[in-house]
Every structure is written in C-alpha cells, then in structure tokens.
C-alpha cells in the first residue's frame, strides 16, 4: 500500500511538471528574481529595473495593469507571471540583451505613441520578445528611432509568438536594423489609419547604411495591413543610401487583404539589389513590388 501511494505521488508530480512545460509557463525563477505587483517589494516595473544588477536578472510581474513609461538601460528579463499582465505605456531600450515575455503592450488612453522604442543614443544588440502583444498605438508597436543624423545601429531582434494589432502607422518600424527574425507571429490592421502621406505597414525596414543580414520571417500571418500610400504594404524594406545588397526570407507565411504584400526599394532611386526569397507564402499576390523607378 505504501509503495502504491509513493508511486501515485511521484506520478502526480510528473504530471504537474509536464503540464507546466506544455503550457509554456515558468513557475520556478532564480533566487535573484525581483517580483513586481501588489504586496511585493516593488510595486512598479521601473522600480524593479532600477534595483536590478544588470546581469540578465529576472523581473517577474504579477497579474494586473501597469501604467508606466519604462526606461531600460540594464540587461533584464521582464516576464509576466501569467498571461494577464498589461503595460499601458511604453518601454525605451538603451541596453543590450533585453528580454520580454507574456507582456501585453497597450496604447489605449495613454500619451505614449509607441510600445517599444529603441533609443537613438547608442548602438543596441539583442532584443528578444516572446508571447507578447502590441495593440492600439498611435504610431508603432515597436520602433527604432535611428536617423541620418544619429545612425546608431540596432542588431539581432528576435520576435516569437507575438501579435501586432491596429497600430496606426506600423506594427514594426525599424531604421538601421541588420539582423531580424520573426517567427509564429501575427500582424493585423496595422497602418490602416496612417495619413495618406505616410507609409502604413505591418513591418517597415529602412537601412541607413551597411547591409541587411539574416532578415527572416517564418510562419507568420499578415492580414489587412497598410493604407493608400504607394509604398504601403504588409512588408516594406528599403535603403536610404542605396549602397547595399542582402536577402530577405519569407517561409510559410500567409498574406490576406493587405494594401500590398511585399515592397522593396525606394522611389526615385536605382534598384536596391534586395533579393526576396519567398518559400510557401500563401496568398502572396506577387513576389515583390520594386520601387526602383528613376523619376526626376
């Protein structure tokens, strides 16, 4: 009888562990983890970031809505303890290797125009976003603010199992990014409300200098994105100085009801030499629309 009870207890623990793994929920965090929420030492996410030791420390956020505009200058991992964590605000990234998981970024009833902003003040390498969402921002869900005056580089962005919905200008707008991987994500109704003189897109990449490398989009849906601008599309990529080459890969993606599906190049400039590799793209109306007309 005792052996039977022991075996039953062991089986229960195995089943609980298996269910935790299958649900994708991490229940065991390092001892160094900082917890945020009502009744915890840190009641705001920013206070936990400020207290972190900048060595990839976990910041675990309890269920709830947090109205904050974060500034992240340390390497931290910000993880929702459940799928019920909403950030009504934004996060500005000025550190390498920042990680977000199970955070719902919301632009509703806030002053922030963008969900995540890559700081233009320094080069940033490594941003990982897993199982998050970006909805309802007046500009972009995720944006890099590099420009010709401050052409700081952003490299190694990885986004998985994340949705971008109804962001006014774009789901993602990246200036001067080189390495970019999107996998098992969805983009819907981004760029629909952009002014006609602005480019409404699900994803917009604009490289200021250098070459694209490892730009890949896998198993991702693009539905009803874009506006009436001639360069509007589900996916748009260009290069200001027109002095590069590179390859962009789409693998097992769905395109449905977008203003245009894929656009490369820039108007009024020669061909930009971007190679678009499309593998099993469902609904794609044409491989690529090239904006390479040398108009004067």
Describe the role of every protein-language-model region.
Residues 9-21:
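Bacterial N-terminal signal peptides
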């Amino acid at each position: 009888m005792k052996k039977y009870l022991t075996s039953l207890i062991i089986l229960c623990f195995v089943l609980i562990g298996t269910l935790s793994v299958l649900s994708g929920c991490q229940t065991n965090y390092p001892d160094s983890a900082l917890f945020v929420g009502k009744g915890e030492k840190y009641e705001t996410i920013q206070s936990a970031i400020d207290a972190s030791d900048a060595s990839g420390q976990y910041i675990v956020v309890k269920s709830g809505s947090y109205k904050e505009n974060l500034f992240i200058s340390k390497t931290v991992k910000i993880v929702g303890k459940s799928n019920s964590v909403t950030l009504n605000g934004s996060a500005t990234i000025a550190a390498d290797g920042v990680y977000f998981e199970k955070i719902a970024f919301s632009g509703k009833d806030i002053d922030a125009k963008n969900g995540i902003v890559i700081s233009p003040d320094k080069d940033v390498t490594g941003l990982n976003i897993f199982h998050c969402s970006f909805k309802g921002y007046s500009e972009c869900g995720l944006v890099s603010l590099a420009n010709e005056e401050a052409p700081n580089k952003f490299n190694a962005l990885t986004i998985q199992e994340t949705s971008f919905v109804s962001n006014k200008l774009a789901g993602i707008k990246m200036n001067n990014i080189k390495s970019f991987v999107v996998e098992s994500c969805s983009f819907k109704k981004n760029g629909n409300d952009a002014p006609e003189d602005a480019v409404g897109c699900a994803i917009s990449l604009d490289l200021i200098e250098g070459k694209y490398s490892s730009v890949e989009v896998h198993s991702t849906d693009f539905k009803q994105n874009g506006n009436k601008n001639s360069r509007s599309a589900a996916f748009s990529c260009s290069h200001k100085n027109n002095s590069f080459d590179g390859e962009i890969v789409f693998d097992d993606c769905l395109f449905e009801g977008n203003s245009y599906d894929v656009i490369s190049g820039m108007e009024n400039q020669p061909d930009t030499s971007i190679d678009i590799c499309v593998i099993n793209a469902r609904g794609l109306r044409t491989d690529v629309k090239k904006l390479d007309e040398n108009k004067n």
